[in-house]
């Protein structure tokens, strides 16, 4: 089977894609958590910035931090493992875009939870993607999950993103 011939490539690619998702979500959260830790809420909300401007700044800063972390991994993947993520072609951009939108949306939901529940919600900020990873079928097809978990997994965009990544790599 092509899947087993490309096992290293499939696992590495999914690991890189998941790392990008994790970085985009946690970068969004970290920027807001730093405001909580430094007790800088007063300065943040007194500044003449609209909420949309704060969200836009968090979004672009999270993208920049994600790219700084992921580009070296993509570059080093080929010389060390003989796998090139760039061979996926144009669909790679759409996969990264989908993961970034999901990560940023999750980051926005966690940030709203931090605003509502305070620092006690910090555990959710760190664990949200680790909780979703088994249901997101990052490293394996959805068919491996029990039927009742498949029903839950079908509600997550992650399943379809990683299934498509595996499909592109195998075919």
Region roles according to the model:
Residues 36, 45-49, 114, 118, ...:
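Short helix-loop-helix connector
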Residues 160-171:
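Transmembrane alpha-helical segments of integral membrane proteins
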Residues 2-34, 95-112, 132, 144, ...:
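Hydrophobic alpha-helical transmembrane segments of membrane proteins
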Residues 2, 22, 77-85, 115-119, ...:
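Short helix-capping/hinge motifs at transmembrane helix termini and TM-loop junctions
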Residues 8-78:
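Hydrophobic alpha-helical transmembrane segments of multi-pass membrane transport proteins
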Residues 32, 44-45, 139, 143-146, ...:
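Transmembrane helical bundles of ABC transporter permease domains
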Residues 114-155, 159:
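Transmembrane helix segments
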Residues 51, 56-124:
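Alpha-helical transmembrane segments and their short interhelical loops
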